[in-house]
C-alpha cells in the first residue's frame, strides 16, 4: 500500500514538473488551434461554419462539417462515415460557410471569395438542416430547398 502511494506521489510530482517547464520556442510560436464549434441541429441566417465546425441532424445520424481543407461535407457516421454530399471545394484551407440573410448558403475562401453557393437567394425557410424523415432520410436543406436528396 505504501509503495503504491509513493509511486503515485512520484508520478504526480513528475507531472507537475513537466507542467512547470517552459514551452520550447517552436511550440510557443505556433498558432493556437481553434476549437471546433458545434452548431446544434440547425444553422440560422447569419450563422457561420468555420473550419472544423459542424452541425448534426435532429437524431444525430448525419453531420454537416466545414472541413479544414475547405470542403463542406455531409457524412453518415452510422454507415461507415459515408459521404452523402460535398461542395467539392477542397484545396482552400481556412474557408468557411455562411447562411446569408438573403437565403443563400455560400462557401467562401478565407479571403472572402465565393467557392460554392446553394443559389437559394429569396427562398423560403430560415435554417440549414438535415432531414431524418423516412421520405428523404439524410437530405440537406437550405430553407425549403433540398440541396441533395437522401443519403
What are these regions (language model features)?
Residues 31-151:
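Beta-rich ligand-binding surfaces for carbohydrates and other polyanions
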Amino acid at each position: 500500500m505504501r509503495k503504491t502511494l509513493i509511486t503515485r506521489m512520484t508520478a504526480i510530482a513528475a507531472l507537475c514538473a513537466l507542467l512547470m517547464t517552459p514551452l520550447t520556442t517552436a511550440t510557443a510560436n505556433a498558432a493556437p488551434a481553434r476549437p471546433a464549434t458545434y452548431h446544434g441541429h440547425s444553422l440560422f441566417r447569419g450563422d457561420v461554419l468555420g473550419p472544423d465546425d459542424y452541425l448534426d441532424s435532429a437524431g444525430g445520424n448525419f453531420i454537416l462539417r466545414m472541413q479544414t481543407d475547405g470542403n463542406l461535407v455531409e457524412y453518415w457516421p452510422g454507415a461507415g462515415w459515408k459521404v452523402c454530399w460535398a461542395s467539392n471545394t477542397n484545396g482552400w484551407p481556412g474557408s468557411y460557410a455562411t447562411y446569408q440573410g438573403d437565403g443563400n448558403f455560400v462557401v467562401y475562401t478565407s479571403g472572402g471569395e465565393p467557392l460554392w453557393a446553394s443559389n437559394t437567394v429569396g427562398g423560403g425557410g430560415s435554417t440549414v438542416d438535415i432531414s431524418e424523415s423516412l421520405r428523404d432520410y439524410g437530405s440537406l436543406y437550405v430553407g425549403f430547398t433540398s440541396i441533395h436528396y437522401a443519403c
